[in-house]
Amino acid sequence: MKVGLVGTGLMGSEIASRLLEVGYDLYVHNRTRSKTGEIIKKGGKWVDSPKELGNRCSFALVCVTDGTAFKQICLGNDGLIHSLNKELVIGNLSTISPSDSVECAAALRKYGMRSFQMPVMGGPDIAKKGELVAIISGDKNSIDKNIRVIESIARSIFYIGKIDGAANYVKLALNMNIALIGIALSESILYVTKAGIDPGIFIEIFNSTYFRTSLSEKKGPKMIKNDFEARFHLGNMLKDLQLLVASMKPLNISLPLSVLAEQMYQAARNRGYSELDYTAILAFLKDFNGLQPDGIKQGI
């Protein structure tokens, strides 16, 4: 089966490697061609545009940063929508707004193309092993037709329903939880550190309790060492919080903690932490409190 992938960043490159590993004939496109080098070495085939990728594949996955990029890939002059292959199915892995998903799905339908939303949970290491969690909404027949491909990259698959954009709401809600947990853990670490307590002992105690999380277990020990190598950029977390806050208005709700989290991550980006891992919110808090976090990129 010929599968296409547009977007070979941190997540996309590992998803591509996984698809090649399990034997799919993979075509790839990325805005920056050099970022596909390793994938090509592993057997992937480069194409010059999303349109050409659509001509060659029966199923195209898109894994990009934001809604603007996704709409350009789908609806732009060389977009998937202009492919001659009207049997093409498009699966969107990107974390974008529900409204952008609805807009693109409607535009693709006018051209006789089918699509669905499939944002995923799990970082690049999880993607490499094919153990992502997939949250899916949209055309059920298209999903069923490509379920083997989906199962090759996801260990858990949740179908939210046929309404376009539903999966995006769930994804944003999940990322909001991650952002808030990251802030809470960061503030706790800073609090005990300023009290003269070894933060390593605090993390050990925390991880021995019922309240431990995968974040505290996997990220906590790195955070106290100022190790913020990006697996999910702080700037991308801010983008997701902005999407969530923007989507509150049509839902007619107010989520105060989410708004505060957005403001904190915005301030962290303004101080120069955007390209670090989202857990660098701890580094920002140290900076904000007049402490210089050692051994990492400093605020500006």
Task: Enumerate the predicted regions with their spans.
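NAD(P)+-binding Rossmann beta1-loop-alpha1 motif at the extreme N-terminus of oxidoreductases
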Residues: M1-C63, L88, L93, P124, ...
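Helical "substrate-binding/catalytic lid" subdomain
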Residues: D164-F288
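Hydrophobic beta-strand scaffold residues
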Residues: L26, W46, S115-F116, I157, ...
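Rossmann-fold dinucleotide-binding core
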Residues: T95-N175
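Rossmann-fold NAD(P) dinucleotide-binding segment
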Residues: P50-S115
